[in-house]
Structure formats: C-alpha cells, structure tokens
Amino acid sequence: MLQKTNRDSQEALQWLSRFLHLDHRRGKEQLSVAGTKDKRAVTVQKVSLQRGRKTLDEVWRMVNHIGQPVSSAPGTRERRTVELATTTRAERGLRIAQLAYADAPLQLGMLAGNQFTITLRNVHWDNEAERLSDKDRSQLSEALEKRVTEIQKDGFVNYFGMQRFGTGAVSTHVIGIAILRGDFNEALRLLLSPEDREDERDESTAPPHVVATRAGRKAYAEGRYEDAHRLFPKICVAERAVLDKMRMPHWHPSDALGAFQNIPRSLRLMYVHAYQSYLWNSLVSERIRRFGAFRCVPGDHVAELDAALDASTAVTVAGEDAETKHSIEEVVMPMPGGDVILPASGWMADMYSELLAKDGLTPSMLSTSRQPEYRLKGSYRRIVQKPRNARCELIPYEDADAPLCETDEEKLLPDVHLSPRAPLDAPFLALQLVFQLPPSSYATILLRELLRMDTSAHTQKELTKNSADQKVASTHSAPAPP
C-alpha cells in the first residue's frame, strides 16, 4: 500500500522508481496501479512492483532509505534507521506499508471503488454571518444531513470532474484532439507552448513552480532543450519526458511522434480519454436538459445494475414502458469509440456529429489512429450514480491549520496524534463527509451537487484565501514555509 501526500500519481511513481533504483526506461512499466488518485489530497492505494530478485524487506528498506545519511549536508554521519523510519513521517510524502507478494501486477480498472473523507472548513449559510449561533448550527447540521440523505436516494449526474481535463493552461482534451487527428506537432505545441497563459502573476508573487515553468517554456521556444528539461519542475512529468527525448543528440524536429511517445503510456492515453470524457459530458448534459435526471425515458440505453460496463456490455434500448420498467440507475450513455454503436439518427446522433466536426474529427478517426494505443474502443457509463455509506459531521475548530482528520500514516506513528476536539462554541465549523463511490466517479461532482456551489480549484482557492479562519490564522502565525 502507498500513501502519498500532495503528490501527483505519476510523480509519486517516479520517486518510487528512483528509490528502488529501477531502470530509467523500464521503471515506467515496472510499477503499476489500478487507478490514479488526486494530487491535492492524502491518498492510499495499492501499487504493484515487478521486483526482480528484491525481497519485501529489501523493497521496504530501499523506499525508506535505511542506512542512508539522514541529511545531505556535508559531513553528516548519522544514518537513517528502521526506528527512525517507523517513528517519523516518511520522506517526500510517500509511505509504504502492508507489503505482500502477488502473482500478477495491477492493471488499470482493477478496483471496486474509492472511499473518501473530505473536510471543508469555515462552513456557514450562504450570504450569512460566518459566526453562527447555536440555533443556526443546529439548522445547518439538519440541512446537511437532509441533503446527504437526498443524494444517497436520488444520486447525482455522473459527470467526469474537472481534474479529468487537467489544471494547465490547455485542457487535456484539447491535446487529445490533436492526437486523434494524428497531428503530433500540434500536440507538442499545446503541451510546451511558451505563452504565459497558466498564471498572470508577475515573478515576485507567482509560486516557484510557475516561475520555473515559464522559464522552461521560454527555453523550449528558443530551442534550448537541455536547459528546458532542467528548468521545468518535476511535477511537469509530460513536459520533462518530451524534453528528455528532444535533448538527445540524435533527435530531429521531424520526429514529433517519437518525442511525444516518450511520455509515460498512462499519461499519453489520458489525453485521448479526456476527449472521450468531454464528448460524454456534453451528450449527458443535453440528455438531462431534455428529459431530466430522475427517470428513464424511451430511447435511453439501459444496462443491468450489476453489469460490468465496457464495450461488450449487453445494452438494450428502453421502450415505451421505460419509466415503469427501468430505474434511472440503469440508464447508461455510450462512451464514443469503435466498438460502441451510437444511434444513427435523433438528437444524440446529430449532436455527436456536430461536436466532432467542430474539432475537425469524424467518428472513424476515433478508432483508426495509426498508433493502435490511441484507438478508442468505447464503453458505457451510468448517467446517475449514488454514493454508498455516506455520512456527514460538523466539527468545531479554532485553528485553521490544525488537522481534523487522522491519516493512515499518522495512525502508525506512535507520537503523532490529532489534537483534542475544540469546544462546541469554537468560532469555526468544518463539514466532514465520508462516502464511497464506484471507480471513475468524481467526489468533486458529488460535492458540487451536495453544496450547490462551484467546486473548481480557482473558486475554492479564493474561498480559502478570503475565509474568516484564514484571516485569524494570518494574525497569529508566521507565514507557512514554501
């Protein structure tokens, strides 16, 4: 099991590859996971390693740097011990535990679902005072519990979340369009363009990674690929992988495909799958606009609730008795691809053709790429999803920086514990939500439906920046380290 903190999945696997001294090229394939996890979170998941002759003990010691200097400072003699590794937080925000042998590696999709614990701070009624009375708190708690009950009963529209489309200046699905067109020069341009679109702050106020990214883009634009590779921060996994190929003496600008193919395979496929997700979201929005999200209607595609959804799933078209025969949970929307048949006529066929034409694509181009790995087979996805075992709790707190949820790593460490709960009349309230979702369903979409507010990263950053608890924290504490 791997716990990662504030780490992108690809970046975390790259660090593990380095710790385990895996081959620079093959390391991408020797570590595998069943699914990617959010970056800005503490996440726990299984990771499989093609270990060669390494034992479990050797793997654990290598990842925990047993016997290595505890500091990179010159003259350091102290070495990292097993005791130190089991009593202090793991380095790089990566903790491994519960190692075991397995007969086969993990593959994408080999998971039943995900459990989330999400804590939202400084909760209050919209457009009301942030300091709530006891009566207001009681009413807020009742309202939230009612909303959780409703969303468990009725579900939420199962959109792909914004993280599916990336947080960069160019959405991942736009790069996917270039790939499906076979235009890898355009894909590289979109990925490495030097335009300062991602952050308009000047260098005195922009975060270090933004400044470094700008410098890397500028070096790329000037043809200084070695410098660009060095300047791009390690979180820019795709950009650095492309530049790693470009900086080689034998690479030629005509080989845009070769440079792009140097990106880890799972990341490359993310771009075309993002476009597939964009199409699906668009089609579902139109279906909901026409017919709502609470009933099955004639013409809907339906699949049994326990069916594993892929291109071979047995799907039927609902007839005139749709509303009485099928629940909204059975309704699925095709994920466009070569192995999925979409209606030949009607609103869905018209909209699908219009979306593709706008992007310079045809239906056949989604499944006939010269690169087989980019050929989309298609699948089905339920348009409404219901969370399982959902519950909520309002937690009073005083310190904006105090943890309100214990991580798995903290449960293992003997001297790390949550602080005692704040008194009930503490100035601030946090909402803690716990729920389970099937694979590929997005917690951010559930939150948007539950709270009826914008859950985009930009909006949430602004809310945090301007919240009352942060203002109190800024007057009592020193600036956080970079």
Task: Describe each model-derived feature in a short phrase.
Residues 1-482:
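Non-catalytic, substrate/partner-engaging modules appended to enzymatic cores
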